[in-house]
Amino acid sequence: MPHSTPSTRSDIAVIGAGIVGVCVALKLQEQGRQVLLIDRDHPGAATSFGNAGLIERSSVFPYAFPRDWSTLIAYALQKKTAAHYHWKALASLMPWLVGYWRHSSPHLYPAAIAGALPLIENSWTEHAPLIEAAGVSRLVNQNGWIKVWRHQDTEQASLDQAKQSLAYGLSVKVLSNSELQIKEPGLDPALIGGVHYPDSRQIHDPQALTTAYLNLFLQRGGRFIRGDAQSLQRDGQRWQVTTDEGPHSADAAVVALGPWGEDLAQKLGYQLKMGRKRGYHMHFAARGTAPTHVIVDVDNGYALAPMQQGIRLTTGAEFALRDAPPTPVQLDRIEPIARTLYSLGARLDQQAWMGSRPCTIDMLPVLGPAPKHPGLWFCFGHAHHGLTQAAASARLLAEMICGRETFADPKPYRVDRF
C-alpha cells in the first residue's frame, strides 16, 4: 500500500476509498484542489471489490421493483434465484421497499431513467482517460456483455427492452442460438437466443482498477490515510476526522462511503430512506475455454464474468440487514444452474465473497451538498452501478464543489429530495 506524507490540513477530505471515493479524489485533484483520501481499509476492498466489472454504458434502465403479481408471489415464496430475503430484516427494510416499489411505477419510473441517463451516457468517456493515465488499459475487456435466455416469455421481454434501448443510441445485436455458439462456444447449445450489448466495457479486476486509480492520485500529489469515517464532525468552519496519524481538518468533506454512507448521514440528521441489496460471488476455474464476454442469465438472475482470478459467478439481490452474517443461499442454488449454462471447473475460493449495494428508493444516487451543513457533500447510493457511474458522478460533484458549470443537471440527485 502506498503511503503519503502526513498532514493535519487539506482543502478537501474525501471519506471513503471505494471506486466512487477514489474517482471523486481524482476529479477534485484535476480541478486543482488539495485532497486527502481517508478509509479504514485498503481502497476498493469492500463493495467495489466484488462486482462483475461492467462499465455499463448500455444500462439505461435502472433495476425496477417487479410490478406483476406472479413475479411478486414467486419472490415472496423464495422461488426465484434472482432474489433472497431474511424474514427478520423485512420490518426494517419495509419503508425502503415500499418506496422502491412506488418509484418503479409507470408514473415515476421514467424519472429514474432520465435521472440516471447523464451518468450512464458519460460512464465510459469519464473512465477512459483515467484508465489511460493510470496505465491499466490491459484490464479492459472491450467485448461488452451478452444476455441469454431459455424461455419464450423471457425472450419477448428481453427483445422488447433491446428495442427500447435503440432510442438511446445504443448498439444492440440480437443473437440466434447458432450465433451465440459462435460468440461463446462454451455456452449451453439449448439456449434459445440472446442479446449482445457491445457498448459496455468490462474490467477484469475491479480492485486492481481502484488501486491503479489510487496510485495515480498519489502520483499527482494526493494523500491517503487510514481513519474513522464515523468520527467526522464540524470543527468551527472546518470539518475534522480522526485518522491513524491524528485529527485532520479540511475546508470541505465528501462522504463517499457506499452502503455505510447513510449511517453518517443519519448521525448528522439526514433521512435518506436507503436500503441495501447484498450480493455474493465465487470464482471458478475454466474447463476448456473461458468466456470472452460477461454472460447474464436473465432467467435465473446471475452473471458469469471473466476475471483475472477465474470465472466470477455473481448473484442477484439478497434483502437483509447490511451487517447480518453471510447466507450465500443464492450462490448454492445458482451454481448447478450455471454449470448447465457454461462449463465451469472447480471452485477457486475457500468461501463466498459478500458485498452490499447501497440503494435509494428512486434508483438514483445521493450526490450534492448537505443542505444543513456548509462544506459537506454526499456521493453514494449508486446501487448496482457504482463502478459504472463512479467517474461521471465524481466529475459532476467536483464541478459543483468548485463552482464550475456542470455537465448535467444535479437536481435529480439532491440530498433533500426524499
Name the predicted role of every residue range.
Residues 6-18:
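Beta1/beta-strand and adjacent pyrophosphate-binding region of the FAD-binding site
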Residues 21-22:
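N-terminal Rossmann-fold NAD(P) dinucleotide-binding loop
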Residues 30-49:
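Glycine-rich FAD pyrophosphate-binding loop
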Residues 51-54, 59, 63-103, 231-234, ...:
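Active-site substrate-recognition segment that forms the wall
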Residues 94-215:
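Rossmann-like flavin
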Residues 172, 299, 340-418:
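C-terminal catalytic lobe of FAD-dependent flavoproteins
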Residues 175-183, 225-239:
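A conserved short coil-to-beta-strand element within the FAD-binding core of flavoproteins
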